[in-house]
């Protein structure tokens, strides 16, 4: 079996975010890392929407990311620390829309190792040097400079190693133009390591160390080091030189401290805490991330605590000496992995879990009532400041980037009966968790819907003048009339536009600079800017059947297949070409391309005829109306559309932005198929046809604009958008009801919209999230969802949600009541009334936990609920709250053979589980009966067990439960579940159970798969085979009777198969006279499974399912990852295909090596050598290679570049999207 890996949705969790002017313009962009992906985002300063400019897979782990700019430069470069053992400097090239690798310097081994640098990066604020550090021992400094041609140069590395030293954080200190200096949080463990008593370990202190790079001596010195009182977790650089006092802020537990090199005294201030917080008061508070904003006259920091509260930190200075630190509560947003403050006044928050946000900073919070805390305020030792959290006041949310990270569980099923299955994804963490329903399609936002007096049959938009940015009129055609609407603040009917209103319209357009043309069945109406009208009437009894118009040309087809061609002359007159052309059959559809910039006319006309052909006809004056080429079609054409697509934007000498693309002829057929063929711009030949089935109705095509490029809207029983995005063609359905006719629409509120008609309504739509594969509906949950099952009869979901370090609702209410009583008791006689009021206000206050976070209860505290949910409406039908410290780990829905048709839900619960050091007071299996057609859970009984029941699976009318490392069969009893049989020989802990026939496949938490056979007659569970590798299995899926696919904690996927001669009729030989080796207790079972495939995904996979994703498609193995990625593994059906893709992969490995210097083959073989899998993500980078490299690779394969692209597209569309 050979598989091909494809990513459907890239990871959405963000681990790092940096900002800078990467494209060299004044506009700031954000570069984010999503594990093994680099992405460039640009927030639009006018609309506040975040657009993705570029996404690149780096096939390596991005461990650190920094932006830097050379002194006096205008462009920021990106330094990447990864697991490749190399430092890589990238530059964004806006003209090619790609990251270019400027430097790649090797310094160590590959992999994420303790002493190989790459974990921490620090840049001198003036861009003169960069320090790259490991977790332990090694630090390297590179000097950055320019050569004579102003290109970036990099020196050989200077070492600043110190053995037995752990590093916690590194930053560059802003010292102006003096020797660059770096500050590190370090800890020396040499004494602790050599001291057997453990005293030294308890006394080890963290130190703040300054390293100075002497530019004169080209050498790094350890300048100064001092021990710290508290344990710091990160450093913030304070602006220096002429901008500020220099130095660093150390964020540590409960305190923030300012330190500077020299005799400056330390200034420290406690981190304020929430008033009346339900958290454990003994728990320390730390800052987790920060952002700096610096202008010429001032600077401030925004730092976020682990509860999500942001504080604005300012420093008071007296002659460059810091005298106090001031903190002021700013706002609360979800806890971030990184924050960026942009010059345009935006705050980008890359959340640790869940969606990412872009906020507008509306106020700086200087003049509000919020109390300001200062290091100068007197406090008792151990006391702190208190503040009251509140909803957003200084920030305004302007955009939200959907993120599925972390996906904890996913099932694919068509519960909504839509033909195409939906993905039901349990994601998020704690109170920000959600169940999301993903459907393949683009999200459509409706900006306006208005009813029309009848059912129109067509709609167009036109501008008044060629220079206009926005459209002026919407023209709606009915069976016997035409309605003209003007576009302004509102849309109103106009009567003096010059259009003929008493007839239906076939087409209309802006002609020349400022004239309009209307084509109707009896003629052509040319309306000049001064409202003069010229008319051309059809001869005799003939009428116009079809037409095609653009800015300078009009072509009409009369009854009987006669073509008449008009072209505009320089004076603005429409002139008929002397000859007319008779076609051999009736004309069904026609299309003209837009006139290319700087040219007089479009050279080609495409005509579709009744005889199932499409013909290209020349409009060049030298051979006007002569046929150039023809293509036979499998069915009758319905509509045609010529567009220029796939171009990269370029600026010509005059600064005009044009794009160099290819001409494509899109052909919509009456049987619901869309064809896309390449139209040769010189000869007019048609080649390289791609086909896709869109739906059951004839396909109508419309040209629209998306992100400054032409795109095609195709309408069948569903509407689809064909567009080019990041050097790949996308054909994506719109998640919207059926439309009938459409046109591009541009107005101030909606610069790239679509106006469409559906029955008797006119709709204005916008598509914002281009490039998105799925649109999603999210239903909020209370705790982290762990697993869910689908009730087969009602299609309801039964979800178990469990959080560690959390309180149940009952405990929270109890704690609040207790605190309120304490408040009243603590008050004196005269303050009793006031205290009672405060206590009442405290009890009534309810800040949403999804923003303000849930109180942390401490380790060993668990909260769980069992939820029954309708997945289509998203409403909760039943909610069972478990008691404090009961944690639900497994769930199953099953029928028992002795109870008939009733459905039961079994939930495995652990009691008082402590994770480290591990201990558990036992567990229970709760049994519920599903009543009311699967909408309510009726509690039957709970069965005590001795360990955590981490896996439950229905089995032959009974149920299999993995209790710790015991595998048991239970049956339903009156008072509890009855144990029927057990097996004690599983190694560590059962994490999952799959069943097929008499076989049970058990996944062990660290010993891969174990095959067990249930013998009914002897009532025994007997192990008959296992795997040879230790795998830390997270999830598994059965592929057939002998084959299982599994994923492990380290990001690998494997497929394991039992050899054909495996015998599962083994005996546990009770007589004991068999050979010892057949008992196989020492090294597992006597029969071993074979590994069919191994593949390193690079992200922990938490769900696997064999399913089909598109109606009529083939089966594939779908996986979802912890970082929010969704991918599929598809089997090759022919040896030729496998051979072809193997060669594509081989050539791309050498021609297009990964961006961060990691070797592709060794990345995919991180833990196990990659076996029988071809990396489709690498193969698809063929599309973004430079044309000459594409040509080289395809010549090696004896193909042309379009043929290779077609193969890549075909394998994708056969299985997915």
Swiss-Prot record:
Recorded name of the encoding gene: SF3B3
Organism of this sequence: Pongo abelii
Residue segments, region Interaction with PHF5A, SF3B1 and SF3B5: 105-119, 145-168
Site keyed Interaction with SF3B5: positions: 284, 306, 352, 429, 916
Residue numbers spanned by region Interaction with SF3B1: 1028-1049
Keywords from the named record: mRNA processing, mRNA splicing, Nucleus, Phosphoprotein, Spliceosome
Main localization of the protein described in the UniProt heading: nucleus
Description of its domains: The core of the protein consists of three beta-propeller domains.
Name of the featured protein: Splicing factor 3B subunit 3
InterPro entries assigned: Beta-prop_RSE1/DDB1/CPSF1_1st, Cleavage/polyA-sp_fac_asu_C, RSE1/DDB1/CFT1/CPSF1, WD40/YVTN_repeat-like_dom_sf, WD40_repeat_dom_sf
Region (Interaction with SF3B1 and SF3B5) location: 193-231, 786-804
Subunit structure and binding partners: Component of the 17S U2 SnRNP complex, a ribonucleoprotein complex that contains small nuclear RNA (snRNA) U2 and a number of specific proteins. Part of the SF3B subcomplex of the 17S U2 SnRNP complex. SF3B associates with the splicing subcomplex SF3A and a 12S RNA unit to form the U2 small nuclear ribonucleoproteins complex (U2 snRNP). Within the SF3B subcomplex, interacts directly with SF3B1 (via HEAT domain), SF3B5 and PHF5A. Identified in the spliceosome A complex; remains associated with the spliceosome throughout the splicing process. Component of the spliceosome B complex.
One GO location term (cellular component): nucleus
């Amino acid at each position: 079996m050979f598989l091909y890996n494809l990513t459907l949705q890239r990871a959405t969790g963000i681990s790092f975010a940096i900002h800078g002017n990467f494209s060299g313009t004044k506009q700031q962009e954000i570069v984010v890392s999503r594990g093994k992906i680099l992405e460039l985002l640009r927030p639009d300063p006018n609309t506040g929407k975040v657009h993705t400019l570029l996404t690149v897979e780096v096939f390596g782990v991005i461990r650190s990311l920094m932006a830097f700019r050379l002194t006096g430069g205008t462009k920021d470069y990106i330094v990447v620390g990864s697991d490749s053992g190399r430092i890589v400097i990238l530059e964004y090239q806006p003209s090619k829309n790609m990251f270019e690798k400027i430097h790649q310097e090797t310094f160590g081994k590959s992999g994420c190792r303790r002493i190989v640098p790459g974990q921490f990066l620090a840049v001198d604020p003036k861009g003169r040097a960069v320090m790259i550090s490991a977790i332990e021992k090694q630090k390297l400094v590179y000097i950055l400079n320019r050569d004579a041609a102003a290109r970036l140069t990099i020196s050989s590395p200077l070492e600043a190693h110190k053995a037995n030293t752990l590093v916690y954080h590194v930053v560059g200190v802003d010292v102006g133009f003096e020797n660059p200096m770096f500050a590190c949080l370090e800890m020396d463990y040499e004494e602790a390591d050599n001291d057997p008593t453990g005293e030294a370990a308890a006394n080890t202190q963290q130190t703040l160390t300054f390293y100075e790079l002497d530019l004169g001596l080209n050498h790094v010195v350890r300048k100064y080091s001092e021990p710290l009182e508290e344990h710091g977790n990160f450093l913030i650089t304070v602006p220096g030189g002429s901008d500020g006092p220099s130095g660093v802020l150390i964020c540590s537990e409960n305190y923030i401290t300012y330190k500077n090199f020299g005799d400056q005294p330390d200034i420290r201030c406690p981190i304020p805490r929430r008033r009346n917080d339900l958290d454990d008061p003994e728990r320390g508070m730390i800052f987790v991330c920060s952002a700096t904003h610096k202008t010429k006259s001032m600077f401030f920091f925004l730092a976020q605590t682990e509860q999500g509260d942001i504080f604005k930190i300012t420093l008071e200075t007296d002659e460059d000496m810091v005298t106090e630190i001031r903190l002021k509560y700013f706002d609360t947003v979800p806890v971030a992995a990184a924050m960026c403050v942009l010059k345009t006044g935006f705050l980008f928050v890359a959340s640790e879990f869940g969606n990412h946000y872009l906020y507008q900073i509306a106020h700086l919070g200087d003049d509000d009532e919020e109390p300001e805390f200062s290091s100068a305020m007197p406090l008792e030792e151990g006391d702190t400041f208190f503040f009251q959290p509140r909803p957003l006041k200084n920030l305004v949310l302007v955009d939200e980037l959907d993120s599925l990270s972390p996906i904890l569980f996913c099932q694919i099923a068509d519960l909504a009966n839509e033909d195409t299955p939906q993905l039901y994804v349990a994601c998020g963490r704690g109170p920000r968790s959600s169940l999301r329903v993903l459907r393949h399609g683009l999200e459509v936002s409706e900006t306006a819907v208005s009813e029309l007096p009848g059912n129109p049959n067509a709609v167009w938009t036109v501008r008044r003048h060629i220079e206009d940015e926005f459209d002026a009129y919407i023209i709606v055609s009915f069976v016997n009339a035409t309605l003209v609407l003007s576009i302004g603040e509102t849309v109103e009917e106009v009567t003096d536009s010059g259009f003929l209103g008493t007839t239906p319209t076939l087409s209309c357009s802006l002609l020349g600079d400022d004239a309009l043309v209307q084509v109707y069945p009896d003629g052509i109406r040319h309306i000049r800017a001064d409202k003069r009208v010229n008319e051309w009437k059809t001869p005799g009894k003939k009428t116009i059947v079809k037409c095609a118009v653009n800015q300078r040309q009009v072509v009409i087809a009369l009854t009987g297949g006669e073509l008449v061609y008009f072209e505009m002359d320089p004076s603005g007159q429409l002139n008929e070409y002397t000859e007319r052309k008779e076609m051999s059959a009736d004309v069904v559809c026609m299309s003209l391309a837009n006139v290319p910039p700087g040219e007089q006319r479009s050279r080609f006309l495409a005509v579709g005829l009744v005889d199932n052909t499409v013909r290209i006809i020349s409009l060049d004056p030298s051979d006007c109306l002569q046929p150039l080429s023809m293509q036979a079609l499998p069915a009758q054409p319905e509509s045609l559309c010529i567009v220029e697509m796939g171009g990269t934007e370029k600026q010509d000498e005059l600064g005009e932005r044009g794009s160099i693309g290819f001409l494509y002829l899109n052909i919509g057929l009456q049987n619901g198929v869309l064809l896309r063929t390449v139209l040769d711009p010189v000869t007019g030949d048609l080649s390289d046809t791609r086909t896709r089935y869109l739906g059951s109705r004839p396909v109508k095509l419309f040209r629209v604009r998306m992100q400054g490029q032409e795109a095609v809207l195709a309408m069948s029983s569903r509407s689809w958008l064909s567009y080019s995005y990041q050097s790949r063609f996308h054909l994506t359905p719109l998640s919207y009801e059926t439309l009938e006719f459409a046109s591009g629409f541009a107005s101030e509120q909606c610069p790239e919209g679509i106006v469409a008609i559906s029955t008797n309504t006119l709709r204005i739509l916008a598509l914002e999230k281009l490039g998105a594969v799925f649109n999603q509906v999210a239903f909020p949950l209370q705790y982290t969802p762990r697993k869910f099952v689908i009730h087969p009869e009602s299609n309801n979901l039964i979800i178990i949600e469990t959080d560690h370090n959390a309180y149940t609702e009952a405990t929270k209410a109890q704690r609040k009541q207790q605190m309120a009583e304490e408040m009243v008791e603590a008050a004196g006689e005269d303050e009793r009334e006031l205290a009672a009021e405060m206590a009442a206000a405290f009890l009534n206050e309810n800040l949403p936990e999804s923003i303000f976070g849930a109180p942390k209860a401490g380790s060993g505290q668990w909260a769980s609920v069992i939820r029954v949910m309708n997945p289509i409406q998203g409403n909760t039908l039943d909610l069972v709250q478990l008691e404090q410290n009961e944690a639900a780990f497994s769930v199953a829905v099953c029928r028992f053979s002795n109870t008939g048709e009733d459905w039961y839900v079994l939930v495995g619960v652990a009691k008082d589980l402590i994770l480290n050091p591990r201990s558990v007071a036992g567990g229970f299996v709760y049994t519920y009966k599903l009543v009311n057609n699967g909408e309510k859970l009726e509690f039957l009984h709970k069965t005590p067990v001795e360990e955590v029941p981490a896996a439950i699976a229905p089995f032959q009318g009974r149920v299999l439960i993995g209790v710790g490392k015991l595998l048991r069969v239970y049956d339903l009893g009156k008072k509890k579940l009855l144990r029927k049989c057990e097996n004690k020989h599983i190694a560590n802990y059962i994490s999952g159970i799959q069943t097929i026939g008499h076989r049970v496949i058990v996944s062990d938490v660290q010993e891969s798969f174990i095959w067990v056979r249930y013998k009914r007659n002897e009532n025994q569970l007997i192990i008959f085979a296992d795997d040879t590798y230790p795998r830390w299995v997270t999830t598994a899926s059965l592929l057939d009777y002998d084959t299982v696919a599994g994923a492990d904690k380290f990001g690998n996927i494997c497929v394991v198969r039992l050899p054909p001669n495996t015998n599962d009729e083994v005996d546990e030989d009770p007589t004991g006279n068999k050979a010892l080796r057949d008992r196989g207790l020492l090294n597992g079972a006597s029969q071993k499974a074979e590994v069919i495939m191994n593949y390193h995904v690079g992200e922990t996979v938490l769900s696997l399912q064999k399913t089909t994703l598109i109606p009529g498609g083939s089966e594939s193995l779908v996986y979802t990852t912890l970082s929010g990625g969704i991918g599929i593994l598809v089997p090759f059906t022919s040896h030729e295909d496998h051979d072809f893709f193997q060669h594509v992969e081989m050539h791309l490995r050498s021609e297009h090596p990964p961006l961060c210097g990691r070797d592709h083959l060794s990345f995919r073989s991180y833990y196990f050598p990659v076996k029988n899998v071809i990396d489709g993500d690498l193969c698809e980078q063929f599309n973004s290679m430079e044309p000459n490299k594409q040509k080289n690779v395809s010549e090696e394969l004896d193909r042309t570049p379009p043929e290779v692209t077609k193969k890549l597209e075909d394998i994708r569309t056969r299985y997915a999207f």
